[in-house]
Each structure stands twice: as structure tokens, then as C-alpha cells.
């Protein structure tokens, strides 16, 4: 005759352990879903587009203080045919040089605005149109492209941290002999 051995397990501690495990799992923060991330990105992209439109208005008004207000404290500006402007004073000199050109008319439009999934960085690229007077009072026209990198600041506001632009036109050649 064969002996059958039945072992009993106390279920109280096992059930308590499982309950604690499930309770701890339920306390984990839920990962943001794709729809929430996309909604936040779209809102931030709209904010950057509006800030950029306001920046264009400051440029059209030749408002140096208004223009400078869009830059973060640690911004860098990479203007064409000039050294890098990597502090507030250098940026202001560069902007003042641009906005005080005789006969200046300047505007730009974003082609694309994108914000990172983390929501702290964004970029914008687009095109610009500019007219000014040459040294003889004749109009000079230029078109080109722009690139701006924006960063959300600790206070939640967006500021430009990198700004650059350059012409689509070929470099003029000298006709002097």
C-alpha cells in the first residue's frame, strides 16, 4: 500500500505578500501615453510659433530691446559674415548692427516647428526676406534660411538659445580689376 502525504501551506502570509506586491505595483506612476505627449508637443509648438511671430514684429519695429528679450541668458547667435555672439553684450551689438541698417525691412516665416518628447527643447527652421539700402542708397534684397533652437526655461517660458541665418544668394564676385 502506498502512502499519500498531503502538505498544507499556510495561505495567510502568501496572500498578504501577494496583496502587498499588487499594491506596490499600483503605486507606480503611469507612463505618459502617446496622446498626452503629442498634445503637450502641439501646445509647445504653437507657443514657439507665436513667440516667433512676436519676434518678427519686434524686428519690423526695429525694437532692439524687444528682439533681445527672446534670447535666453546663455544664448548664442551665429550671424552670417560675423563672429559668433556668445554673450548678451555681443548679441545686442550684433542685433543693433542689423536693426539699424539703412532702409532695413526684415521678416521671416517658420517652415517647421518641432518639440522634443521630453518637452524641454524645440527647434524652428524657415525662410527670411530682407531688404536694405547699399552704401549708395540703392536697394539690396536678400532671401535665406533661419534656424532657431528654443529651450523651456525653469519658469516654463520658452527662450531661444541658438539663432542663425544665412543667405540663399551666391556671394557677389568682385568686378574690380
Cite the ranges covered by each PLM segment.
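Short beta-strand edge/turn micro-motifs at domain boundaries
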Residues: 28-33, 143-171
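Bacterial N-terminal signal peptides
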Residues: 12-24
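A solvent-exposed, acidic/Ser-Thr-rich amphipathic alpha-helical stretch
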Residues: 42-47, 64-118, 127, 132, ...
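Short, low-complexity N-terminal intrinsically disordered segments enriched in polar/charged residues
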Residues: 27-69, 73, 172-177
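A short, structured loop/turn motif at beta-sheet edges
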Residues: 115-122, 151-157
Amino acid at each position: 500500500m502506498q502512502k499519500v502525504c498531503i502538505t498544507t501551506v499556510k495561505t495567510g502570509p502568501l496572500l498578504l505578500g501577494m496583496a502587498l506586491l499588487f499594491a506596490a505595483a499600483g503605486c507606480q506612476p503611469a507612463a505618459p501615453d502617446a496622446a498626452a505627449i503629442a498634445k503637450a508637443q502641439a501646445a509647445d509648438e504653437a507657443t514657439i510659433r507665436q513667440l516667433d511671430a512676436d519676434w518678427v514684429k519686434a524686428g519690423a519695429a526695429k525694437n532692439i530691446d524687444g528682439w533681445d528679450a527672446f534670447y535666453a541668458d546663455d544664448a548664442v547667435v551665429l550671424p552670417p559674415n560675423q563672429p559668433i555672439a556668445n554673450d548678451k553684450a555681443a548679441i545686442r551689438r550684433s542685433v543693433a548692427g542689423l536693426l539699424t541698417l539703412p532702409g532695413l525691412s526684415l521678416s521671416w516665416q517658420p517652415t517647421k516647428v518641432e518639440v522634443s518628447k521630453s518637452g524641454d527643447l524645440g527647434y524652428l527652421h524657415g525662410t527670411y526676406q530682407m531688404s536694405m539700402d547699399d552704401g549708395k542708397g540703392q536697394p539690396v534684397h536678400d532671401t535665406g534660411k533661419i534656424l532657431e533652437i528654443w529651450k523651456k526655461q525653469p519658469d516654463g517660458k520658452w527662450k531661444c538659445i541658438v539663432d542663425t541665418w544665412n543667405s540663399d544668394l551666391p556671394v557677389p564676385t568682385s568686378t574690380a580689376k
